[in-house]
Curated annotation (Swiss-Prot):
The gene is psd. It is found in: Cell membrane. It comes from Cupriavidus pinatubonensis (strain JMP 134 / LMG 1197) (Cupriavidus necator (strain JMP 134)). It is an enzyme of class 4 (lyase). The keyword Aminoacyl-tRNA synthetase does not apply. Its main location: membrane. InterPro entries: PS_Dcarbxylase, PSD-A. Heterodimer of a large membrane-associated beta subunit and a small pyruvoyl-containing alpha subunit. Binds 1 pyruvoyl group covalently per subunit. It catalyses: a 1,2-diacyl-sn-glycero-3-phospho-L-serine + H(+) = a 1,2-diacyl-sn-glycero-3-phosphoethanolamine + CO2. This is Phosphatidylserine decarboxylase proenzyme.
């Protein structure tokens, strides 16, 4: 499995180093019991920024989950970023989920659009249109179908990181972004896509199949 990233995300290294050093200093000067709450915080930071490799399903028409979390939306809507009717599937990430974002399909980035906004609870439907967000529109390499991935900031998450640009080619499971401390990813698919998940279901980035696309003849 080719996943060329450290098991602890680079985005978390400064936080982890700071938490570790403060815990160590308090431990050395005041003892273990005074430092215990700080060590617990350090362990929380460590688990929050974990970024493990994941197996990728072989089905060529599968759309993979872009993030770990829980399904909160499966419905037909308008895709405001690609201007079409679409099937929308949303993944809500709480603070205990892995927060790296990974490409759902193989394809080329056709459009990248950032929107400033609010920071309401990402579990709410209005977060998709009111919160700070970053949309990546991907045209599938195999058949030209469009898949839109939208990183949505949450109540605690105030920083969306996106590492791709227009013209880049992405592979399924490729890491393309990160959102800190609780957030959401909206996935807009062709309206003919067949959902493979239901509301409330827990999913894993790159491993869970969200939907299957029809073959384009």
């Amino acid at each position: 499995m080719n996943y060329p990233h450290p098991l602890i995300a680079r985005e978390g290294w400064p936080f982890l180093a700071g938490a570790f050093l403060i815990s160590l200093l308090v431990h050395a000067s005041a003892g273990f019991w005074w430092a215990l709450p700080l060590w617990i915080i350090t362990l929380f930071v460590l688990q929050f920024f974990r970024d493990p490799p994941r197996p990728i399903p072989a089905q060529p028409n599968a759309v993979l989950a872009p993030a770990d979390g829980r399904i909160v939306v499966v419905e037909k809507v308008q895709d405001p970023y690609a201007g079409r009717e679409a099937l929308k599937i949303s993944v809500f990430m709480n603070v205990f989920n892995v927060h790296s974002n990974r490409a759902s399909v193989d394809g080329k980035v056709e459009k990248l659009e950032y929107f400033p906004g609010k920071f309401v609870n990402a579990d709410l439907d209005k977060a998709s249109v009111e919160n700070e967000r970053n949309a990546v529109v991907i045209r599938r390499a195999a058949d030209g179908q469009i898949v839109t991935l939208v990183q949505v900031a949450g109540l605690v998450a105030r920083r969306i990181l996106c590492y791709t640009k227009v013209g880049d080619s992405l592979s399924r499971g490729q890491r393309y972004g990160f959102i800190r401390f609780g957030s959401r990813v909206d996935v807009y698919l062709p309206v003919s896509a067949r959902p493979r998940v239901t509301i409330g279901e827990k999913v894993s980035a790159s491993s869970t199949i969200l939907a299957e696309l029809d073959e384009v003849k």
